[in-house]
């Protein structure tokens, strides 16, 4: 597992204020880090988000995209049962998580497996933006 320290970029980057503000805003969302998630680089052009959604059924989860924003919502459909807890360590609250997507990122699919919601993404760069080799004659 790798963690990245972005602080050296702050010292040498000029004109990227929006990018860093977006990164900081994503880290300090007001939902207290619930539910926890991982963002994985699968290979050069493929990414996967894994969100811990234990206790949510597939029909209680909603994934939408709009303007390069991925929104994942979880809402319990039923009324909470009257229970007496001696200790409650499993959160049962609804949530909304937002992820800012870079240009040319497309959602390829999602699956719910063993309490984790996996969202697979791919970066598809148009041919016009890819570097091309010019033949010298």
From Swiss-Prot:
Disulfide bonds: none
One Pfam family here: HSP20
Keywords noted in UniProt: Chaperone, Cytoplasm, Stress response
SUPFAM superfamilies associated with the record: HSP20-like chaperones
Keyword Hydrolase: no
sHSP domain location: 28-137
GO CC, alphabetical: cytoplasm
Alphabetical list of InterPro entries matching this protein: A-crystallin/Hsp20_dom, ACD_IbpA/B, HSP20-like_chaperone, HSP20_IbpA
Known role: Associates with aggregated proteins, together with IbpB, to stabilize and protect them from irreversible denaturation and extensive proteolysis during heat shock and oxidative stress. Aggregated proteins bound to the IbpAB complex are more efficiently refolded and reactivated by the ATP-dependent chaperone systems ClpB and DnaK/DnaJ/GrpE. Its activity is ATP-independent.
PANTHER family: PTHR47062, SMALL HEAT SHOCK PROTEIN IBPA
HAMAP family for this protein: HSP20_IbpA
Similarity remark: Belongs to the small heat shock protein (HSP20) family.
Name this protein carries in UniProt: Small heat shock protein IbpA
Organism expressing this protein natively: Serratia proteamaculans (strain 568)
Lineage, broadest ranks: Bacteria, Pseudomonadati, Pseudomonadota, Gammaproteobacteria, Enterobacterales
Gene (UniProt): ibpA
């Amino acid at each position: 597992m790798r963690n990245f320290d972005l602080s050296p970029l702050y010292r040498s980057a000029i004109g990227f204020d929006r990018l860093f503000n977006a990164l900081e805003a994503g880290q300090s969302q007001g939902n207290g880090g619930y539910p926890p998630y991982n963002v994985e680089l699968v290979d050069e052009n493929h990414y996967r988000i894994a969100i811990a959604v234990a206790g949510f059924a597939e029909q209680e989860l909603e994934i939408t995209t709009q303007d390069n924003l991925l929104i994942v919502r979880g809402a319990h459909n039923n009324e909470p049962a009257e229970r007496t807890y001696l200790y409650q360590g499993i959160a049962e609250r609804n949530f909304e998580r937002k992820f800012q997507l870079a240009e040319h990122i497309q959602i390829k699919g999602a699956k719910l497996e063993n309490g984790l919601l996996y969202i697979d993404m791919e970066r598809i760069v148009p041919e016009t933006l890819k570097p091309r080799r010019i033949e010298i004659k």
